[in-house]
Amino acid sequence: MAARAVLDEFTAPAEKAELLEQSRGRIEGLFGVSLAVLGALGAEEPLPARIWLQLCGAQEAVHSAKEYIKGICEPELEERECYPKDMHCIFVGAESLFLKSLIQDTCADLCILDIGLLGIRGSAEAVVMARSHIQQFVKLFENKENLPSSQKESEVKREFKQFVEAHADNYTMDLLILPTSLKKELLTLTQGEENLFETGDDEVIEMRDSQQTEFTQNAATGLNISRDETVLQEEARNKAGTPVSELTKQMDTVLSSSPDVLFDPINGLTPDEEALSNERICQKRRFSDSEERHTKKQFSLENVQEGEILHDAKTLAGNVIADLSDSSADSENLSPDIKETTEEMEYNILVNFFKTMGYSQEIVEKVIKVYGPSTEPLLLLEEIEKENKRFQEDREFSAGTVYPETNKTKNKGVYSSTNELTTDSTPKKTQAHTQQNMVEKFSQLPFKVEAKPCTSNCRINTFRTVPIEQKHEVWGSNQNYICNTDPETDGLSPSVASPSPKEVNFVSRGASSHQPRVPLFPENGLHQQPEPLLPNNMKSACEKRLGCCSSPHSKPNCSTLSPPMPLPQLLPSVTDARSAGPSDHIDSSVTGVQRFRDTLKIPYKLELKNEPGRTDLKHIVIDGSNVAITHGLKKFFSCRGIAIAVEYFWKLGNRNITVFVPQWRTRRDPNVTEQHFLTQLQELGILSLTPARMVFGERIASHDDRFLLHLADKTGGIIVTNDNFREFVNESVSWREIITKRLLQYTFVGDIFMVPDDPLGRSGPRLEEFLQKEVCLRDMQPLLSALPNVGMFDPSFRVPGTQAASTSHQPPTRIQGAPSSHWLPQQPHFPLLPALPSLQQNLPMPAQRSSAETNELREALLKIFPDSEQRLKIDQILVAHPYMKDLNALSAMVLD
């Protein structure tokens, strides 16, 4: 049922009449309304005069158009919002429908001032809404998060792909590689927008599609550029293209120039055999992130065969968009059973995919095992790149010599093909952009699911294990592997050399033909180390552990070897390597992340015994974020570290323990480990979550450090943290006192939590005194000072079983046979305390201090503490303790 048309009339400034006339077509196309400029109110109206405007259309559309017109005529806010340049395709791609939907949804006027910069103007509410949307887009783009449900994720990818291909332009490929969460947000923005303001006027709809760039305003004048200039800019942009479009054009040129050349599939089948098994191969296709974006590119064997069949029905002509539409139609015809693949198949396909890019199988399996096969392929690619770089750097350090044969291989002219695609002449950003799209294109190669040691098209970082006498046979094969140094990955990436100049060679990950090919290991593939006496079968086992890939000519030699014999006495390192996983490298260096994950494999259980604690200890306030990040080596938020710290103070007798952690840390995050400890501590009432919430994708979180200081101030407790709270020193006097005297620092040695014996330095109190409540000692001071020659700070004061307590609080001398774990807190001993009440009853009441003595003590204290802040405190102490005559005891009270 069509919406009832309404008529609305309102006024606008007369000087905006020209702007409204120029923007009429764009406003009508955006909101599906008819706009009429009626004229001025009258000559008697004082300047500036206003003119009448009339809107006709659906009620909601008229309301939105009215808000938009008010915003461009009398804007309340004018803001500029930045975004990553890689997100430029969102605002100009898909015929600018996303930008139009954003304007329709917020009623704010958006114009692209430059790549990475948007101009926003309109009413205050509209500008705030538009900025919130854009900031949320940026957040989703930078986080690259997956959707919680894999089925929902595939549906979002399919719908977004169909939507983008229906409005295809030069930015289609860039839109298809956006993160899935951002795709879902864009679909939500555009869903129903086309039908919301639909009026049935075909001309209006056609104008919305054809005049996509007319609404782009000039940043200097605020007016729309003319249609002729827009057309010229559009043609210039089509000619210039993007890194993705340039790569696609080069691929089209290569394939169109050599139509008879087909890429040999990895499974080694002929084209006829491949056509017969086409259905079986389709069932093995994995609909991953890369697959959903654009399947069956031009250099896929399946696509070449389908292009011959569909030549009469559709004209492909190297058009990427037509190819994408064929792929989407083909994927829709597949049944749900065919689309679903097992986890093992997905894992094998993902491993083979990264192997074709030139990475070793060990590194790929290691990274996938850590992050999981459901992670975004781009994130996996980044981690594999980092791991490969670390591995190659470590291997370069172990390489002893450089062999002169590298100069021979350099001059063999392997990269002399005119059709090869290199990135030497492109800038760095273009290289990175091209690499992402090369990932998408290589994902379409028809590789088999079964993992093999090495196949014809498999590009793996390998050691050369070919004997010298067999080298000429290998160089005579149809595809040769040359070990070259990759300047971007700092690693070895074998390059494929084709005997025919017509074939295309793809340089792996931006490798250059000018880079010297330096084999980091000798020709026999063994490390430059003194070897023990081993049989040949043990050597081959070592080579397999190193990830070697031997040539087909060396396979018969391996098959004739005898079965391996156990040699625990001769080679313990080999037996250890066998017990390790297949992804472990014997010569790879250990990283902090690896060591941390190894410690997580050791089980730990938080056990707090149900027994009474001590009442003389201060409240313990733990900075949970600081403790967790420290235990996680500044890379992970380790909840185990918080549990270890709580258990440490619980064993000391503390029962008043509070841990503060931001609430957003309880969400699912791969960098937050063992979150069940947070749940356990929260159930015990030890964990307190500081408030945090999400508003339009932006996190609004309270500062947890303020909660720490507030609680320590109210309870007189100690804050366990390594933070110095420098920004809160001047907040208040009480907070400064907490930061100065009540911060307990710590350290972790693996899973061992350690605190210092002297938290305030060598001249400060010991740990047991630091942890005790101050009220216990303060109540004793008047009584002890009244006793003859007995005082807390008197050198003659002795506690049985301990040393004399001096003002310097020097630690007691360690005994020769004492254990080395001196960092553990010592239990305080006060055997004199029970005898104090009876002692007080037998002694006469001491005489009160005279006014002269009070003045002398006050002057002496003012000389010691000249600050004006402490003068008031000195007067309060002297009034509160009229019997106290000991200057040392009074000084201690001032310091407290």
Swiss-Prot record:
Instruction: Extract one GO BP annotation from the record.
Output: cellular response to UV
Name the organs or tissues of expression. Detected in heart, lung, brain, liver, skeletal muscle, pancreas, kidney, spleen, testis and ovary.
Query: Where would you say this protein principally sits, based on its record?
Result: cytoplasm
CDD domains linked to this entry: KH-I_N4BP1, KH-I_N4BP1_like_rpt1, PIN_N4BP1-like
Q: Which UniProt keywords apply?
A: Cytoplasm, Hydrolase, Immunity, Innate immunity, Nuclease, Nucleus, Phosphoprotein, RNA-binding, Ubl conjugation
Please list where the region (CoCUN) is annotated.
Answer: 849-896
Q: Which residue windows does the record flag with biased composition (Polar residues)?
A: 414-430, 803-813
Summarize the record's induction comment. Up-regulated in response to interferon alpha (IFN-alpha) stimulation (at protein level).
Q: How is its activity regulated?
A: Proteolytic cleavage by CASP8 or MALT1 leads to its inactivation.
Q: Which GO terms describe its cellular component?
A: cytosol; nucleolus; nucleus; PML body
Give the modified residues of type Phosphothreonine.
T242
Q: Where is the KH-like domain?
A: 59-143
The subcellular location is:
Cytoplasm, Cytosol; Nucleus; Nucleus, Nucleolus; Nucleus, PML body
Q: Does Nuclease show up as a keyword for this record?
A: yes
Residues the UniProt record annotates as site (Cleavage): G200, D201, D326, S327, D490, G491, R509, G510
Give the Phosphoserine positions (modified residues): S226, S258, S300, S562
Named from the GO MF annotations, one term is: mRNA binding
The EC number(s) this enzyme carries: 3.1.-.-
Its domain description in UniProt is:
The CoCUN region mediates binding to ubiquitin. Does not interact with NEDD8.
PANTHER family noted in UniProt: N4BP1-RELATED (PTHR12876), NEDD4-BINDING PROTEIN 1 (PTHR12876:SF26)
Name listed for the protein in its UniProt record = NEDD4-binding protein 1
